[in-house]
């Protein structure tokens, strides 16, 4: 059999009319299989042309569900024709031998529509399968992200914490699960404590991996420090981290602030790489931006970072914020938002007060505590948001 031709089953009573009907169909280059019932039809049958009287009315629904079917009749008032049409068969034609060309066109069109419907059903089934697979992969990815976020939060220091009479606290709110923000503070000895505040470019898994590297390296470098020249520790860390990120070739850079507090001389030794917003120091009723500037860490090779220092009074509050905070503030320009942040900080004595004031400007921040774990019920923040506050010196360990 030529498989380029379609096989049409003609169901009608044997006789000259059935033969003529079959001949009219074969004129269009189609094969015809003639039968007087629907019991035995070839598997490759593409369409059925059935006479209204040749099929019992109780079999029309079975026929319609099996193959596309055209009904032919000798009269438009044929009761069997009406029953067949009510079942929902493809179409019908009266006096088919008088309208042989129309019959052939209807057959071709019905086969074409059936092929399109079958293709659509296959596409729908394939799409449902792909959607199910996608949902499964998304669920696994979500579980991985949640697990990664949990591990990342375990790497953060305990909060709040007092080190050598200086109070450290922070608010950590990832955009979704994993964050490109990170911070840490540690006691070196009775005289020195060190801390850092980082905002890795982007957010999500790749940025979070950089924070793990940062944690490992800073712990190692602090353990290797001999306790001499505290003013060199911060810029040396930034330069070393810059080389590490350059060497990884992962296309990530970071803004990074590193500070060393001398608890004997009440001095902050620090260095910074493209920190935005700038660290804000509140002391003696005044709010000032810490001086200094530096290039982003990991963006350019062979960068030297500044060695800076400032005196710390007996009572002070040092605030460090990631740039995600600016996304939560009103104002069309960066300067407007920075001034708004400075105003909120000047009015806040505790981290909770600043957070409450920020929540009044952004509804997402009011949807639950995001400090200890990401809140899966809230919408994603526009960016990772982290705030760190350092205050001293009068706190009891």
Stretches found by the model and what they are:
Residues 1-14:
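Non-catalytic signal-transmission and effector/linker regions of two-component phosphorelay proteins
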Residues 14-18, 210:
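Short acidic/polar segment at the start of the alpha1 helix of CheY-like receiver
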Residues 22-44, 50-59:
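A short, well-structured beta->alpha microelement
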Residues 44-48, 90, 316, 323:
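Conserved acidic residues
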Residues 49, 60-122:
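CheY-like receiver
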Residues 113-133, 137:
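Flexible nucleotide-interacting loop at or near the entrance of a catalytic core
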Residues 128-318, 368, 373-397:
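… and, occasionally, acidic/histidine-rich disordered N-termini of signaling adaptors
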Residues 160, 232, 236, 288, ...:
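Catalytic cores and conserved motifs of cyclic dinucleotide signaling enzymes
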